[in-house]
């Protein structure tokens, strides 16, 4: 599989997993209810009109604009990946692909519904969804790849 295809497949799989999971939750669990009713891990159907941790709640236009900017940045990174060696690898392109998937997954909800469907609750952490997980895992993955590639290439620019 070519590297470009790796990027697009990881993006498509992330979007599909996100949208399918939200469809299943919406079709089977009334808003505000959870399974189980209490406990450390719950599946709970909530509508989030904000971003992570519900910040910028009610500012859908800003969140849509930020998401569109995120899509543009991810696509730009894909097209200039040859200049970023840590990114022009299968793991780098998978990480970038799931970042794009998370951005697009939540953007679809915001444009279509005016809110994002969240449904995973772990402990006291704010409720989130597959798109949020894609974004988090992708960003952490890219950071780790960058750190490792900097050490492997002998980059000592931080000592200058």
From Swiss-Prot:
Membrane topology summary: Multi-pass membrane protein
Annotated Gene Ontology cellular component terms: plasma membrane
Protein's cellular compartments: Cell membrane
Cystine crosslinks: none
Biological process, per Gene Ontology: proteolysis
Main location: membrane
Taxonomy, superkingdom: Bacteria
Pathway assigned to this chain's UniProt record: Protein modification; lipoprotein biosynthesis (signal peptide cleavage)
Catalytic activity annotation: Release of signal peptides from bacterial membrane prolipoproteins. Hydrolyzes -Xaa-Yaa-Zaa-|-(S,diacylglyceryl)Cys-, in which Xaa is hydrophobic (preferably Leu), and Yaa (Ala or Ser) and Zaa (Gly or Ala) have small, neutral side chains
Sequence intervals crossing the membrane: 60-80, 84-104, 128-148
Assigned EC number: 3.4.23.36
Positions annotated as active site in the UniProt record: 118, 132
Pfam families noted in UniProt: Peptidase_A8 (PF01252)
EC main group: hydrolase
Keywords: Aspartyl protease, Cell membrane, Hydrolase, Membrane, Protease, Transmembrane, Transmembrane helix
Function: This protein specifically catalyzes the removal of signal peptides from prolipoproteins.
Family assignment from sequence similarity: Belongs to the peptidase A8 family.
Protein's name according to its UniProt entry: Lipoprotein signal peptidase
